[in-house]
A protein has these predicted regions:
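Hydrophobic, secondary-structure "cap" segments at the distal end of domains
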Residues: 154-163
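Conserved CoA-thioester-binding segment of acyl-CoA-metabolizing enzymes
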Residues: 1-59, 99
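Amphipathic alpha-helical blocks and their helix-capping loop/short-beta junctions
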Residues: 182-261
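Glycine- (often His-adjacent) and acidic-residue-rich active-site loop
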Residues: 60-93, 144-146
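Gly/Pro- and small hydrophobic-enriched strand-loop and loop-to-helix capping segments
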Residues: 128-149, 184-199
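Long, low-complexity C-terminal extensions of enzymes
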Residues: 248-253, 258-320
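Glycine-rich beta-to-alpha active-site loop
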Residues: 101-145, 167-168, 172-177
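Hydrophobic/aromatic residues within transmembrane alpha-helices
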Residues: 58, 71, 123-124, 179-180, ...
Length: 320
């Protein structure tokens, strides 16, 4: 009889000079659990301590998704059972990981091939090198489940074009690989069929030549038209009041579009991004933690997560 051992959702190994962290929970698009977050943090620390590792690479075992974000369905279950200490542990460790990635002393490369949402951006955008492919799709969709853009999103979305950052935060709009480069969420576009070659070269380089290797595998991106198109889609989202932002959004998309988003989450997300200007990531994460704990108890989160993640009828009945 073969004994079955628990399957690891995160694999850590060294390939030459590259310390690899591989997400492998494909059935749920690598949605992050607390054990996964702790496994990633442990792998990161081991690679940092290993003198043979020159570069740290995080990737997915599946081409379908890099990481679909935190397991918010599980957070909803914990909330319904009043297990707020467990929720606090999840967000505490997740945000600590985001900060650790931002402070990583070795080059950190995220290979984003497929979906990257919410917590998936927390694993990638804070790193030095964010490589997207033509299959990449990035988004911060939290307001549709009655939550706020977290994992340091208030930090990185407040540091790109103001209208585009607010548009991404409030609407959960999805951007492709080239658009992610144009909006500065990603640092380069690399065709998916070139990722194996890129990884092979990263495993055989010194820290000083990593940038050159990455650029050799990068595809040129014509930024100007993409940035113009993004600004057009985000028109009006740089207004100084939420009422004006919502008016611009309503004029472009109609009342029905706004009904899909929690009014409380939209209001808090708007203020969160405006307050984040000039603040360091650590402070932004601390503010997000307080809001995340508040929204974990909010009826709009319970209802929004039900409508999007549980019943999937996408017909939320907001209480705010």
């Amino acid at each position: 009889m073969t004994l079955q051992t628990p399957r690891e959702d995160v694999a850590a190994e060294r390939a030459g000079r590259a310390g690899l962290i591989t997400l492998d929970r494909p059935a749920v698009l690598n949605a992050l659990t607390l054990p996964m977050i702790r496994q990633i943090r442990g792998a990161l620390e081991r690679h940092l301590a290993d003198p043979a590792v020159e570069v740290i690479v995080i990737r997915s075992a599946s081409a379908k998704a890099f990481c679909a974000g935190g397991d918010m369905r599980r957070i909803r279950e914990l909330s319904l059972h009043g297990e707020f200490d467990a929720i606090a542990a999840f967000f505490t460790d997740e945000y600590a990981l985001n900060l650790a990635i931002s402070e990583c002393a070795k080059p950190y490369v995220a290979l984003i091939d497929g979906v990257a949402m919410g917590g998936g951006l927390g694993l990638s955008v804070h790193g030095r090198h964010r490589v997207v492919t033509e299959h990449a799709m990035l988004a911060m969709p939290e307001t549709a489940i009655g939550f706020i853009p977290d994992v340091g999103a208030s930090y990185f979305l407040s540091r790109i074009d103001p209208a585009i950052g607010m548009w991404l935060a409030l609407t959960g709009a999805r951007v492709g690989g080239a658009e992610a480069v144009a909006s500065r969420l990603a640092t380069q576009l690399t065709p998916s069929d070139r990722l194996p070659g890129l990884l092979a070269e990263l495993s055989d380089v010194s820290a000083g030549s990593i940038e050159a290797v990455l650029q050799r595998f990068a595809e040129p991106v014509d930024l100007a038209p993409l940035q113009a198109a993004l600004r057009k889609r985000a028109a009006g989202f740089d207004a100084s009041s939420l009422a004006d932002v919502l008016a611009a959004w309503r004029a472009a998309a109609g009342d029905a579009a706004l009904a899909a988003f929690s009014p409380a989450a939209l209001a808090s997300s708007f203020e969160l991004l405006r307050a984040a200007h000039g603040k360091p990531l650590r402070e932004c994460l601390a503010i997000e933690f307080e809001l995340s704990m508040a929204f974990a108890r909010h009826p709009d989160f319970i209802e929004g997560a039900r409508a999007v993640l549980v019943d999937k009828d996408r017909k939320p009945h907001w209480q705010s």
